[in-house]
From Swiss-Prot:
Cellular localization per UniProt: Cell membrane
Catalytic activity field: (S)-dihydroorotate + a quinone = orotate + a quinol
Signal peptide from the UniProt entry: none
SUPFAM superfamilies in the cross-refs: FMN-linked oxidoreductases (SSF51395)
Top-level taxon: Bacteria
Protein name: Dihydroorotate dehydrogenase (quinone)
Gene that this polypeptide is encoded by: pyrD
Organism per entry: Acaryochloris marina (strain MBIC 11017)
A GO cellular component annotation in the UniProt record: cytoplasm
Keyword Cell membrane: yes
């Protein structure tokens, strides 16, 4: 237990009765200020303090993937920095990479509030945000300005979604339009067709719907940027296998497994903010309830591809043990979001230090050696 878990987290979660989205918005304003004011003494001092407290630098954690250098395997998942306003800050928190978005071609407000709920009894969150963001053109300007201020020191992914106003039959143009605006600014790109919070979006996981999207993006991808697809944990095995086959046909760089689940296997009986039972609330569940299924999906994909298609594992990672399990199942990289909210800013450091201890115990020289070994 650290200061965050003992003091700040209980205060934010219960005592202040703070709306989770309001807290998140305030945090992002602070991070955006740090990013914009990198030349100011106060911001510089805070960045140095964050880095010295939260970063772990050890070559045994590093790897090269898709021609990119990852200092460590822990990344910030999409959904946290939706508009890319703090891209220079995330390494200071210890992350080896980060993924911004989900961003859509058209700016959109997302779904009505309240739309984000904590489920502490389950170490989970329920969200139905609906891809609220300022749009791809706005993100391009923000990231360009950030790069003018400071060279990027780590890989940045950009997660692309479909605009709500765009009909499903025009999805290809919507995704390609966002990619055209942003392809200069991302080190890798993710096709998000698995959020449960945009009507009809998950239907784009069907091979006949997904194939033209991937083909359109790859036709525009003249620089060969790594392109991945993010899938839902609720798919049947045959559907996952079909997506894996399609990914290989279209020469995707990898798969992100997994997004949030629409299943409601929870301890939480009623959501405090609404008084409703979880089954009455729309949205996806993230955090601990997704842990086991996401690991199973990772293991399935790794076996299906004989380890030839890199996987970014996400879902229910709170500890070094959780991270180790997903790496052994076949994930080359990992992402966190809900666990970071519950465990606090020291979580990444604790996970990395725990992985190094485990490597020492197992006689492992390089962390990448354990990928897919169990």
């Amino acid at each position: 237990m650290d200061l965050y878990q003992q003091g700040l987290q209980p205060l934010l979660f219960s005592a202040l009765k703070a709306d989770p989205e309001t807290v998140h918005r305030q945090l992002m304003r602070t991070c955006a200020w740090l990013d914009r004011n990198v030349d100011q003494g106060l911001a510089q001092g805070l960045q140095r303090r964050l880095a010295s407290s939260l970063q772990v630098e050890d070559p045994r954690l590093s790897q090269s993937l898709w021609g990119l250098s990852f200092a460590n395997p822990i990344g910030l998942a999409a959904g946290f920095d939706k508009d890319g306003v703090a891209t220079n800050i995330w390494p200071r928190f210890g992350f080896g990479f980060a993924e911004v978005g989900t961003v859509t071609f058209h700016a959109q407000p997302g779904n009505p509030q309240p739309r984000l709920f904590r489920l502490p009894e389950d170490q989970a969150a329920l969200n139905r945000m609906g891809f609220n963001n300022q749009g791809a053109a706005a993100m391009a300007k923000v990231i360009a300005a950030s790069l003018d201020r400071q060279a990027r020191s780590y890989p940045l992914g950009i997660n692309l979604g479909k605009s709500k106003v765009t009909p499903l039959e025009q999805a290809v143009a919507d995704y390609v339009g966002s990619f055209q605006l942003l392809k200069t600014y991302g080190d890798y790109f993710v096709v998000n067709v698995s959020s449960p919070n945009t009507p009809g979006l998950r239907s784009l996981q069907a091979v006949e719907q997904l194939a033209p999207i991937l083909a359109g993006l790859q036709a525009e991808n003249t620089e060969g940027k790594p392109l991945l697809v993010k899938i839902a944990p609720d798919l049947e095995w045959k559907d996952i296998a079909a997506i894996v086959d399609l990914a290989q046909v279209h020469q995707l760089a990898g798969i992100i497994a997994t997004n949030t689940t629409i299943r409601r296997d929870l301890k939480t009986e009623r959501i405090a903010a609404t008084g409703n039972v979880p089954s009455e609330e729309a949205g996806g569940i993230s955090g601990a309830p997704v842990r086991s299924r996401s690991t199973d999906v990772i293991r399935f994909i790794h076996k299906q591809t004989q380890g030839q298609l890199p996987i970014i594992g996400v879902g229910g990672i709170f500890t070094a043990e959780d991270a180790w399990e997903k790496l052994c199942a076949g994930a080359s990289l990992l992402q966190v979001y809900t666990g970071w909210v519950y465990e606090g800013p020291w979580m990444v450091r604790r996970i990395l230090e725990g992985l190094l201890v485990k490597m020492q115990e197992e006689g492992i020289q390089q962390l990448s050696e354990i990928v897919g070994q169990k």
